[in-house]
């Protein structure tokens, strides 16, 4: 854990030098200690990192997760709880991963399902906290809690869903990047 804290502190220092506005980070796992204890541990670590980098404007974008194993972040509430526990929530934001949303049980395949997921983010964290998107299809079923990315249109979310996801006017100025697996047949 100390090495992770040290490493992230160094990454923030490098990002500061390069003018990078935020770093994307999976929140971590509770390792069998329960979600609440895991959130407290994560918030405490972030507080220490923020103290060590107090002059840096770099933010941490917590990424939602699929919920594999004891990973926290598969419920938006987990991310909101971290925001609520850190002493400098203004140093946080979120990165929303489409495959993780789907594997965690958020059915984003329809505009209604997408809107429901985004409404939860808005109510619990705030839409202005969405700093980026990781765009990818999912090789695994809805609510599988297994993190397996696929190429858009090749997975179970489906190509059609990305029409309403990438054209959501609320995020017209929010960056997104493809995070799909390497494949010899795609150039």
What residue spans do the PLM features occupy?
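Active-site acidic/histidine proton-transfer and metal-coordination neighborhood
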Residues: 1-93
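Histidine-acidic metal/acid-base catalytic patches
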Residues: 80-187
């Amino acid at each position: 854990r100390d090495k992770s804290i040290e490493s992230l502190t160094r990454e923030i220092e490098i990002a500061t030098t390069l003018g990078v506005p935020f770093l994307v980070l999976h929140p971590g796992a509770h390792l069998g200690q329960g979600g609440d204890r895991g959130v407290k541990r994560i918030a405490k670590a972030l507080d220490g990192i923020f103290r060590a980098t107090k002059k840096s404007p770099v933010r941490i974008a917590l990424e939602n997760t699929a919920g594999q194993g004891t990973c926290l972040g598969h419920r938006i509430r987990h991310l909101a709880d971290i925001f609520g526990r850190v002493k400098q929530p203004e140093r946080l934001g979120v990165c929303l991963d489409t495959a993780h949303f789907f594997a965690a049980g958020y059915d984003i395949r329809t505009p209604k399902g997408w809107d429901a997921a985004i409404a939860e983010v808005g109510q619990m964290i705030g839409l202005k906290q969405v700093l980026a998107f990781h765009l990818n299809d999912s090789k695994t079923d809805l609510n599988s809690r297994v993190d397996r990315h696929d190429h858009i249109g090749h997975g179970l979310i489906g190509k059609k869903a990305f029409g309403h996801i990438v054209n959501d006017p609320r995020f017209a100025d929010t960056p997104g990047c493809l995070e799909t697996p390497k494949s010899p047949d795609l150039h």
